[in-house]
């Protein structure tokens, strides 16, 4: 399975700096001279190991070690068969019969069959599962009707032909079908890993996986350790163990790397990038990600579009990039990052340009107009919410100063640790809140669809019928140029009404010990670790 920061279409939540938890006395394998154990870092406990429920990058990173899907993305960004042996497609591209590789097994030694895929996919679509990712399967015939209670499970276009073949019927042809099916959403599941309450078992003795690793130990808020799956089909995987240590502070993680307690550091402190960028251990990877602050348009004062736009124009993104990110990011004046291109070479972002800018005079003017429209003599109190991550705190404090200086508005700041913050965000319990959206499918629709109508990720509560119609039409449009034109119109509408403040398009920084090889860095994804080797 390709490693996603969680998958594209559902577009996962991206994190600025990934770090590690309570300090262990054990040195990393590189420091000890061992060749079979990798120690790296993540910023928080995984929210879940259930791909049907996961929407954050940390969960996706760990899930990617434990489970494999039909296809995977290689280091060149191309999609290769993983559990799929071959596929047959009908004339109009609406039926795929996917044949599985022979002798692929679960970690308990039992065979992986087409029934396991059918079970997992229909479980995700089952309304009782409560998956916020179900819309990403709506390209499958009958999936939306079943998920919304308007159809039956038996009408869903997922059919077992025989134990080694799965037939998938689509609502319409999909050009990026392998990209979609490479997602962690489309993994199989063993029924033995699901309890009587339809929950995924997370006890290492009970969780049956099919990826390169199995769960060995999970010490919440300390570390999660995976070990080599002896039943995994790909014998090129030789790494015996990966320990993901959990610390939300990137400086602490950096110190652990420097003291040889980490082999791979994910997320350098911004102030260390300049120092390390000439280091041979330094790696920088582009990300198809957008860091934003989202408005809840149902909460005052952000019920007014002019007020929302005023807050966006009051943000000095150049300062944030230069001073806080040390130029390790790109200023974001739109929502869709660079990198989404047609086969003919059209770059979605470059050909359209910017939607917003830093303009304090215009910001003040719009704020006054918006307040007048609402009949407000004073602006309702505003609280900006963010996570406990050190870098997020710096950005939030900078924005607090910008709103004071450029709008004359005092705002409050409130932060929470990541797992609690996700719950707050999903409940739309905010006026203005940080979020990062990433994914490895370089397609503008993966960003714009987040704000579509009644979609599960539209936490901003923003609705525009014309925007929704354009996004819906783009989902089925097969002509790339026409599709880009539709999505440009959709983004035009988005920034006319401003449901979000774009801040930066980030890149991701790593330090990798010279003794470590085989890490694959893929645009928009977490690192691929299965082929890691460590010199003794």
Which residues does each PLM region occupy?
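N-terminal lobe/hinge region of extracytoplasmic solute-binding protein
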Residues: 41-91, 208
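Aromatic- and charge-enriched surface segment that lines or borders ligand/interaction sites
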Residues: 85-133, 167, 301
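Surface-exposed binding/hinge segments that line
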Residues: 88, 118, 132-191
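Gly/Pro-rich hinge or "lid" segments in bacterial periplasmic/extracellular proteins
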Residues: 164, 170-237, 241, 251
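Ligand-site clamp/hinge motif
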Residues: 229-274
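Detector for C-terminal structural segments
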Residues: 314-344, 391-400, 424-536
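Structural transition elements
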Residues: 331-370, 391-393
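Ligand/substrate-recognition segments at binding pockets and active sites
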Residues: 368-439, 508
């Amino acid at each position: 399975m390709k490693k996603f920061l969680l998958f594209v279409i559902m577009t996962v939540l991206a994190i600025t700096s990934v770090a590690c938890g309570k300090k262990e006395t054990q040195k990393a394998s590189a420091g000890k001279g061992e060749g079979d154990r990798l120690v790296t870092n993540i910023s928080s406990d995984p929210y879940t190991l259930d791909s049907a429920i996961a929407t954050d990058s940390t969960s996706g990173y760990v899930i990617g070690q434990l489970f494999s899907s039909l296809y995977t993305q290689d280091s060149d960004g191309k999609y290769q068969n993983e559990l799929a042996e071959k596929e047959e497609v009908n004339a109009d591209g609406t039926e795929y019969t996917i044949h599985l590789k022979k002798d692929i097994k679960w970690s308990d030694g039992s065979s992986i069959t087409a029934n396991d895929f059918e079970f997992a996919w229909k479980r995700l679509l089952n309304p009782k599962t409560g998956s916020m990712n179900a819309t990403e399967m709506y390209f499958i015939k009958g999936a939306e009707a079943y998920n919304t209670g308007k159809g039956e499970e038996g009408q869903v276009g997922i059919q077992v032909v025989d134990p080694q073949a799965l037939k998938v019927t689509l609502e319409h042809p999909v050009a990026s079908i392998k990209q979609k099916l490479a997602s962690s959403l489309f993994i199989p599941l063993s029924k033995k890993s699901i309890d009587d309450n339809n929950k995924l078992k997370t006890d290492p003795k009970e969780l049956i996986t099919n990826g390169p690793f199995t769960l060995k130990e999970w010490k919440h808020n300390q570390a999660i350790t995976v070990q080599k799956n002896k039943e995994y089909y790909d014998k090129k995987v030789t790494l015996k163990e990966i320990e993901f240590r959990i610390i939300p502070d990137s400086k602490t993680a950096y110190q652990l790397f420097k003291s040889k307690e980490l082999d791979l550091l994910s997320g350098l402190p911004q102030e260390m990038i300049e120092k390390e960028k000439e280091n041979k251990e330094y790696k920088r990877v582009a990300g198809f990600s957008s860091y934003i602050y989202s408005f809840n348009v149902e909460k005052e004062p952000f019920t007014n579009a002019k007020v929302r736009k005023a807050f966006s124009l009051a943000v000095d993104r150049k300062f944030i990039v230069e001073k806080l990110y040390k130029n390790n990011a790109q200023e974001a004046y739109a929502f869709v990052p660079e990198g989404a291109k047609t086969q003919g070479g059209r770059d979605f972002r470059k050909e359209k340009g910017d939607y917003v800018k830093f303009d304090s005079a215009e910001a003040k003017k719009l704020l006054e107009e918006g307040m007048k429209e609402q009949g407000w003599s004073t602006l309702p109190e505003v609280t900006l919410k963010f996570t406990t991550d050190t870098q997020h705190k710096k950005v939030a404090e900078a924005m607090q100063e910008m709103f004071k200086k450029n709008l004359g508005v005092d705002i409050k700041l409130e932060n929470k640790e990541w797992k609690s913050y996700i719950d707050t965000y999903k409940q739309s319990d905010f006026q203005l809140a940080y979020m990062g959206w990433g994914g490895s499918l370089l397609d503008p629709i993966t960003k714009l669809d987040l704000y579509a109508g009644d979609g599960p990720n539209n936490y901003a509560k923003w609705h525009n019928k014309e925007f929704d119609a354009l996004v819906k039409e783009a989902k089925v449009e097969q002509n790339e140029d026409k599709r880009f034109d539709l999505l440009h119109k959709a983004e035009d509408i988005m920034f006319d009404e401003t449901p979000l403040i774009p801040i930066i398009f980030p890149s991701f920084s790593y330090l990798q010990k010279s003794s470590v090889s085989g890490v694959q860095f893929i645009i928009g994804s977490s690192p691929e670790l299965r082929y890691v080797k460590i010199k003794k």
